[in-house]
Amino acid sequence: MASYICIDLKSFYASVECVERGLDPLNTNLVVADTGRTEKTICLAVTPALKKYGIPGRARLFEVVETVRNVNAQRLRKAPFHEFTGSSCQASELAQNPALKLDFIAAKPQMAHYMEISTKIYEIYLRYIAPEDIHVYSIDEVFIDATGYLKTYHCTPQELARKMIREVLQETGITATAGIGTNLYLAKIAMDIVAKKIPADENGVRIAELDEMSYREKLWSHTPLT
């Protein structure tokens, strides 16, 4: 049976910026946007911590500023003596201390640097998969035909996906989500829809699987699929 893996690097541009600053991409409030332009500029990426406040991945900068302002108004009402004692862009610190003001980092885009990191990650995939079996869908997403490799490595598709994702995390600090399917479509849908509904592991990794039967059971009536 054919087996395909789709891997998406989590909030890639934002994660690269966090790692460059020695920060945890899953715990840091950061957007990638050129603040030298107007606040109507589009954010190229938003970290998961900031998305939890309802900010979409491609928000305009003024939407981020407005959301943060509203969150801080709520936090101020709950803060001791209704005043802030400081600010933080770290989700864990904000959760522990209600007297901290929500802050975020705005990182100027570095497209050439993102390409370098993407290439480095692609080279990690090449340790396990031949280039003809890797389709680069975008700077942060690939499709892999793993069919001919499972017997070679004596592993399941999920084990192979997890091994590659773990090495990417260890060497770049960037985590990922993966979908596994018996065709490219099912792998993509498993990643985009099913993986979002399952709990992440300790590294923020989610891996979901779909075959024709489980697709009918879970998603036959699901809309939209893209």
Task: Say what each PLM segment does.
Residues 1-226:
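Gly/Gly-Pro- and Ser/Thr-rich, intrinsically disordered tail segments characteristic of DNA damage-repair
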